[in-house]
Amino acid sequence: MNVIGADPHVMYDEKSGYYYCYATSGDSDTGKYFYIYKSKDLVEWEKVGYALDTSINCWGKDWYWAPECYYNPNNEMYYLFYSARINDDLVEEHFENKNYYECAKIGVAVSKSPEGPFINICNKPIDYFPFDKDYLDVDQIYENIFDVRIKEEDLPKGIVGQYIGTIDVNLFFEDERIIMYFSRCCYKNARHDKVLNKFIEESHVCAVELNTEWWFDKDAKMMPTIKEKFINQNNLGTIHRRDGFINIINHSNQPQEWEDGHVNDYELSGGKSPNRRWFEGSTTFTKIINDKKHYFVLYSCNYYVNELYGVGIAYNNEPLGFFTKFKRNPIIKQNPIKSLYSTGHGCLVEKNGESYYVFHGRETKTSDRVIYVGKININSEEDVYVSDIKQCKLVSF
């Protein structure tokens, strides 16, 4: 049997000697979310159950996506990070617009065991209000932005600044720093493409640095907080809090053709779907190459049903700031000959001195997403490839 799930994150648990996989499980009638599996070899997996129990401190409405679990040696607790759309009564507080559609935020739950249950630390998401102070809100200028054809130099003046929804959280630990990577949602992020001469809604990979006090809380009751320099960094003179963030991956900084899987969706769907570009599902890590530390980000582009959906990689000499995309992206993509479709959104795992990428894919264009694993080979910033891709198997459930 296949290991069903999407957006997998794998953590090795030294206490038990198991690899634990946490994956998006879809909607729930029971208030429990995110599949848990465990394995000794990354290929054969046992089903454990569900990770998150929202019967206590529930702040999310739906869109429970992309769980990631981290073991904290300071208090011997396990921390589950995830994203969800917030309850209706919280939307205006976080976005200054009660009708904000993609109102996703990041939450944190804890457990004494990697097998859960994970309980939310509090009844609100992380205290973070990311705001793009430079964004021109064209939705308030044009009735339908996807019907507009306008040259870049003719863009009108308008309302500037917008809160952003956040999904696909990933933590990076280095020395005494904790950096939180995430994707800003496409909604309310329409960018004018001067080549295509039209608006495209885009998601971007972004980051913010966290304080570390919560990581040393012996009682595991403290929520993560962002560094003070980011708090209200993008305020435009209002009484509302507007926090900063750092861009990591987007389209305009270094365009690549494979990122354009959905830029004509509005026309092709007869106006039912927006034109979009997705940069999501990031995971950050380092490699020592020729005695030098290199920072890498793996990420996914496009929506998983599209034939161009795949995995890219980018590199930098520091963990913050724009990363340089690998010239031969994507490094994982669909392969109909091998019945491999919808390849994306995974995590890096180390095993016996080798690096592996655990990700989701599909056997057909219509089947459920299931878990795969492949060996990732990084010889330099210009020599990266994935080999020996295997479909994971469920051996106990």
Language-model-detected regions and their locations in the chain:
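Carbohydrate-active catalytic/glycan-binding domains of CAZyme proteins
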Residues: M1-F397
